[in-house]
Amino acid sequence: MKNKVRVAWISAPAFICVDKFIVPEVSKYMDVTWYIIAKENEVLDFEEQLEKLIKLGKINCKILRHKERNCDFGIIIWFIKFLKNIKREKYDLIYQVMIGMPFYMPLFRFYLGCKNVLIGIHNVKIPQGGSNYWINKLYVSFCIKSFKYFQTFSNDQKEQLLKIAPNKHCTSVPFVSMDYGEIDKSVKENKDVITFLNFGIIRDYKRIDVLINAAQRAYEITGKMFKVIIAGSCNDWEKYQNKIKYQELFELIIKRIDDNDVAKIFERSDYFVLPYQDIAQSGSAIIAINYDMPIIASKLPAFEEYIKDKKTGFLINPADVEDLTKTMIYILNNHYKIYNKLVNNVNEFKLNNFTDEKVAEKYINNFNIVLKKFKEI
């Protein structure tokens, strides 16, 4: 019997929400050891699910914790020890998600090289207004220059990378459908107000102010009552709160959302709204697709991959209050005519593109392509 390809899969807690679906599928065909690098006291999302998968023998997962912050010089010793252990294992392929800014990836390159390494890179283009913009930009630039093989999570990011570095090899996979538990569909059927949702960490480039202003204009023009749920943590919420004139329109859940509460928020919502000014890709949009929810989003390449205008949602001019207002008014006037068709279209798109098996198959194909290239060197 031919031995399975041995793969080290190295990532961080932020990616568990996706990897927990993919690693078990890939592990059916490859011998995967999944390393999760976390801070000592960091609470891991889905930890119970991971423990269950380990007990069932579906994954070989090692959670490794360090005391230091990524930016502390003391963490360098911890990283070096970990990387030396990986080197001793002599894996056929190392799949490394880009993590550990600013020290980890330079140390990885020094100790492990790039020959049998595939780098998973989420944001080739760093969104304007994101945290630590220039440091992130330099870190990504270093990685692209220093490694040969990459995997992005959208075709748009793949194209961005190949524009910057046409001599590199880059594949892409979609995000897996991100499932936070079942929803009670009768909740939507029995409620009497249309509900728009924005979910996720609130950052400047996501332009929550555009949603607030557009919702209030739509209310003033139509006089129709509806609901806008804004759910997610925010470091400077007061600047958004000051824009709200009609408190009755908004349900505000401004805090970190527990995983167990995500499905409950989505089951009460009809449309997902993302009026971003810039974006590389959006995990929250994939959650909406998982729950068959039509999306209103900015006309940006990252969203155009997933949203077909007037079929699975609506595309608006980026961060444009007037355009979003028009779209919300159209929905308020036509919701009961258009909604079921939109939902069915989203569901069909999900089944054709985002099942665990389909996404895992793309990972395996990409791994095999890169393994073949290693042998050709």
Would you name each region that the model predicts?
Residues 337-353, 362-365:
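A short, well-ordered alpha-helix in the C-terminal region of glycosyltransferases
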Residues 16-17, 78-79, 94-114, 280:
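An aromatic- and histidine-rich active-site surface loop
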Residues 239-263:
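Nucleotide-activated donor-binding/catalytic signature segment of Leloir-type glycosyltransferases, i.e.
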Residues 145-183:
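Donor nucleotide-sugar binding/catalytic pocket of nucleotide-sugar-dependent glycosyltransferases
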Residues 8-11, 68-74, 82-103, 149:
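Short N-terminal targeting/anchoring amphipathic segment
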Residues 309-310, 314-321, 328-336:
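Conserved acidic donor-binding segment of nucleotide-sugar-dependent glycosyltransferases
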Residues 189-206, 212-215:
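Conserved donor-binding/catalytic core segment of Leloir-type glycosyltransferases
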Residues 264-280, 293:
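Acidic donor-binding loop of glycosyltransferase active sites
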